[in-house]
Swiss-Prot record:
Family classification: Belongs to the complement C6/C7/C8/C9 (TC 1.C.39) family.
InterPro entries found in the cross-reference section: CAD1/NSL1-like, MACPF
Example GO BP: regulation of salicylic acid mediated signaling pathway
Residue ranges of every copy of the MACPF domain listed in the record: 1-332
Secretion signal, residue range per the UniProt entry: none
The protein, known as: MACPF domain-containing protein At4g24290
GO CC, one annotated term: plasma membrane
Pfam families, per the entry: MACPF
Function text: Negatively controls the salicylic acid (SA)-mediated pathway of programmed cell death in plant immunity.
Keywords, sorted A to Z: Hypersensitive response, Immunity, Innate immunity, Plant defense
Length: 606
């Protein structure tokens, strides 16, 4: 909800916001300014006897304003954007805010109603556009020669990588500084087309124009605005309906007809949703709101200040992944280098005189043998953030398990050995034994491996093969460590390889999910890859796919900063057999430290 202020008071607040800090991860609202008064400004703006009176359009007079703050009259315009992909539209929004780059701002997310996980939003969004009326009554801006940071802000910059202090700085001062504010109103229709839509860009543009003309030109249809939607169709209906975007982590229904949507939003003016456009226009002068701002990064004014590099890195991480500000401390604690164990340099690349392990699996009479690396993988007292099955060796015929872990232990964590640290999974319950191919050949034990202690996390893993009758059975063993001085934040979650339905046999189905009707999954778009590593997908593999790859799913099961709130750790795992492939399903948990005399009555049920 915006600040509902009369024109004169809104002008005072707008002028008072110049030089204040702002958190760009959130929407543009005057009430979100850090402080929002002269005394809380981050910039040293000259105030004194030479202050002047500013007269704004509409006869509004604001006394005692610094001469460094200038006022300019605005304009009214209708603007229709091009049909643009996600990142280009995000870049266009940033340019309007005097920002560089393609990372979505809070304004962009609010207008198109995206989540903070922009990589997933970008993967499932085909095109974006908007058409609207923008009324700028006036703008107030700071003279560029007066951009000088106050000394107390420089002194507040942490000199080392201190996640708690960095999170506190961002919470108090924000990420950027306001140097310009445009006041007025806007009435805009935003179009969002999902990846599965077959509609061509020119057709989407045409339909958007038709809907916008009905709203702005004819003004003959009463529209609901705010957070309500107008669902698009071939007949350009104005029926309100929420778009359900495909979510890879959900098994919810997917409607192919809901492949694009129009959203009507207003800023400024009367907030009566039943007002027609022409009626709303008459109220903007009396109740203006901020429609745009310009910013400069706080870090651009910290040259030579000790610790400015750490702050810049923390702000970049925060704006890229947008964790909840109240959880930024824990998020930053986890932004350590991640690596796989064993490291690639330890994998044998040359010819081997004999297999390192005699353990092997065979899935049919004529099929090749899949050798199993039974060497334990232990990362010590460091949290694991991901797992994968991998085919090692020159012939890619040796199955191994790899663990992704943080390079060091976050300072907020303490790990101690679990009393039951080595969990040996050798269930004799044959309901968990599932064939990969032929019934009389190798099986996989799909029983979940997890600790009885909710505060335990995985710190080691091992594959193990045992003979049961005439067939070998593959088992997964895990090692656990206990998190000291922490509490479980929410219920643990299970993830599995994308594209595999969670039904690995009757018993596995019963313990994993309730029976549900078969749902048509959405088409899987290409992921937005922001990893600049030389080999972001793992070590080089042969140009020809290994023969045994048809029996093993080598997808990486990881959770990083892009999975909000960004500090998940592995607390369990299980093997699955899906469509004739051995795969992994991983359990993740969130822990937060118990600070001081804090008493946790019960874990949050999320």
């Amino acid at each position: 909800m915006a600040l509902r202020l009369p024109a004169s008071k809104a002008a005072e607040v707008a002028i008072g916001s110049i030089g204040c800090g702002y958190d760009l991860a959130i929407d543009l609202r005057l009430k979100y300014c850090k402080g929002g008064s002269k005394d809380s400004r981050l910039l040293d703006i000259k105030e004194g006897d030479d202050n002047c009176e500013i007269v704004l359009p509409g006869g509004i007079s604001i006394p005692n304003v610094s001469k460094s703050i200038k006022c300019d009259k605005g304009e009214r315009m209708r603007f229709r954007s091009d049909i643009l992909p996600f990142q280009q539209m995000a870049e266009q929004f940033n340019q309007e805010l005097s920002l560089a780059g393609k990372i979505p701002s809070g304004l962009f997310n609010a207008m198109f109603e995206f989540s903070s996980c922009w990589q997933k939003d970008a993967a499932y969004t085909k095109n974006l556009a908007f058409d609207g009326v923008f009324i700028s009554l006036y703008s107030v801006a700071l003279d560029k020669s007066q951009v000088l940071l106050r000394e107390h802000v420089k002194q507040a910059v942490p000199s080392t990588w201190d996640p708690a202090a960095l999170a506190r700085f961002i919470d108090i001062y924000g990420t950027h500084i306001i140097v310009s504010v445009k006041m007025g109103g806007k009435d805009v229709i935003y179009a969002k087309q999902q990846h599965s839509s077959k509609l061509q860009p020119e057709d989407l543009q045409k339909r958007l124009k038709e809907v916008a003309d009905k709203r702005f030109v004819e003004a003959s249809v009463v529209h609901n605005t705010g957070s309500e939607r107008v669902q698009a169709s071939s007949k350009v209906e104005t029926k309100e309906q929420r778009l359900r975007f495909a979510d890879t982590s959900s098994l919810g229904s997917y409607a192919n007809k809901e492949d694009y949507v129009f959203m009507c939003k207003r800023r400024g003016g009367n907030d009566n949703r039943n007002l027609m456009h022409n009626e709303w226009l008459q109220t903007v002068q009396m109740e203006p709101d901020v429609i745009s701002m310009s910013f400069i990064p706080i870090t651009s004014l910290l040259n030579g200040v000790p610790g400015s590099g750490f702050l810049s890195h923390a702000i970049n991480l925060y704006l890229r992944y947008k964790p909840p500000i109240e959880e930024l401390h824990q998020f930053l604690e986890f932004q350590l280098p991640r690596q796989w164990a064993p490291v690639f340099s330890e994998l044998p690349l040359g010819p081997q005189r004999k297999q390192q392990s005699c353990a092997s699996l065979q899935f049919s009479f004529f099929g090749p043998k899949l050798y199993v690396n039974t060497t334990p993988v232990d990362v010590g007292k460091r949290p694991i953030t991901g797992m994968r099955l991998y085919l090692e060796g020159r012939r890619s015929n040796r199955l191994a398990i790899h663990l992704q872990h943080l390079s060091s232990l976050p300072k907020i964590y303490q790990l101690e050995d679990d009393l039951n640290r080595s969990i040996r999974q050798e269930s004799h319950d044959r309901r968990y034994y599932e064939k990969v191919n032929w019934k009389n050949y190798s099986h996989v034990c799909t029983e979940p491996v997890e600790s009885d202690d909710d505060l335990s996390v995985v710190t080691g893993a091992q594959l193990h093969v045992e003979s049961h009758g005439f067939k070998n059975v593959l088992f997964l063993r895990l090692c656990f460590s206990r998190v000291v001085g922490a509490t479980l934040v929410k219920n643990s979650e299970w993830d599995e390889a994308v594209g595999f339905a969670p039904k690995s046999g009757l018993i596995s189905t019963l313990i994993s999910h309730h029976f549900t009707a078969a749902q048509k999954p959405p088409p899987r778009p290409a992921d937005v890859n922001i990893n600049s590593a030389i080999y972001p997908g793992g070590p080089p593999v042969p140009t020809q796919a290994p023969k045994l790859l048809k029996f093993v799913d080598t997808s990486e099961m990881t959770r990083g900063p892009q999975e909000s709130p960004g500090y998940w750790v592995v607390s369990g795992a299980r093997l699955l057999v899906e469509k004739g492939k051995i795969s992994l399903k991983v359990k993740y948990s969130l822990f937060t430290p118990i600070l001081g005399d804090e008493v946790i009555e019960e874990a949050y049920e999320g």
